[in-house]
Amino acid sequence: MIRRLHRVKVLRVERAEKAIKTQQACLQAAHRRHQEAVQTSQDYHLWRIDEEQRLFDQRKNTTLNCKDLEKWQRQIASLREKEANYELECAKLLERLANERERLTLCQKMLQQARHKENKFLELVRREDEDELNQQHYQEEQEQEEFLQHHRNA
């Protein structure tokens, strides 16, 4: 019975180890996605600054009417809104990354608990083996004693 329970504990340790490997892969993927998003955001930021400068230089020595000024302002606003969306995506991915780290920590705690329980049952199995061996020695001694008693009386 104890051996079967120990086997269950071993399986739980194996399952917890597998969960950690899976979670580590998820964490690495989340980290990679976040890094890519940060790089995209940084690249876009630099491009946006250059693009705003280019648009400004185009209009620098020209007379702007209200319609052209509004169009230019909309272009700039659109560029900045897109940059804000990139930054928002980075923030969301950073939050997901933190969640994946928390899940990994939880998996590690579960593995630690599973190993602790497995070790307890391993000790119980060891004690049971020891008790069985002692019982076997005792039984052998009893049989030997009976044999000697029987031959003395005969």
Curated annotation (Swiss-Prot):
Is Thylakoid a UniProt keyword of this protein?
no
Keywords on record: Plasmid, Virulence
Q: Name one Pfam family in it.
A: YscO
Q: Where is this region: Disordered?
A: 132-154
Q: Could you tell me which InterPro entries the record lists for this protein?
A: Flag_assembly_chemotaxis_eff, T3SS_YscO
User: Family per UniProt?
Assistant: Belongs to the SpaM family.
**Record function comment:** Component of the yop secretion machinery.
Protein name, per record:
Yop proteins translocation protein O
